[in-house]
A protein has these predicted regions:
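Short beta-strand segments enriched in small/hydrophobic residues
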Residues: 25-38
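Hydrophobic alpha-helical segments within soluble ligand-binding/sensing domains
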Residues: 1-28, 74-76, 124-128, 142-160
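Hydrophobic alpha-helical
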Residues: 51, 67-129
Length: 196
């Protein structure tokens, strides 16, 4: 149960490609995966394939970096190091987990690169505020309601049949500034309706 790497890579690839323009030269994908070679990652492969299609003849450098062996402090240091190397600052930074997204958000603010580096993040807690302010271009959100429903369904099948034989792909949504503003309006409307 969850989001498959292929599904996640395809979805991220679509969004990364939508941010590629004639000025895009470098894309960096940050993952925390138990993979020796980033080229073996389905996520990296799908993003790379989508970007190459969108780029056409433009030569875009796509790199992946594995931050698996790092803790919170080390992740923060690794992300900061990316921005300290002025020649290697990516035009698009893809973050595949909440911690890396938060570190990237902070680094973009610290180095005064908000709006210059497009961050495609993961998770929606305080990141929604950064999306609203334009610091993070878009963030990925797993449909937790659907995840819960599938969990109950799988457990029910297991209790009834003694097994479950399906892999449940959970939907993912990408939230940009317009989507976040819509969510806020709906939440405000729901809140006002419950008070009345």
């Amino acid at each position: 149960m969850g989001v498959s790497d292929y599904q996640l890579g395809m979805a991220y690839g679509e969004f990364v490609s939508s941010y590629v323009d004639e000025d895009t030269e470098k894309i960096l994908i940050l993952q925390k995966r138990d993979i020796d070679d980033m080229n073996e990652s389905q996520i990296y492969t799908q993003i790379s394939n989508s970007v190459q299609k969108a780029a056409g003849n433009n030569d875009i450098q796509i790199r992946g970096r594995n931050l698996l062996s790092t803790g919170t402090f080390e992740t923060e240091e690794a992300v900061t190091d990316i921005f300290q190397q002025k020649r290697n600052i990516p035009d698009i930074l893809v973050c595949m987990d909440e911690e890396t997204t938060e570190c990237a958000r902070q680094a973009v603010l610290d180095f005064n690169l908000a709006g210059k580096v497009k961050i495609i993040g993961y998770y929606t807690s305080e990141d929604i505020l950064a999306v609203e302010k334009g610091v993070i271009s878009v963030t990925c959100d797993v449909d937790t309601t659907q995840l819960g429903q599938y969990s109950v369904e799988a457990l029910t099948n297991y209790i009834k049949d003694g097994r479950t034989n399906s892999y449940y792909n959970v939907d993912i949504n990408f939230l940009d500034r317009a989507a976040v503003e819509k969510m806020r309006r709906e939440a405000d409307t729901d809140e006002k309706a419950s008070v009345e």
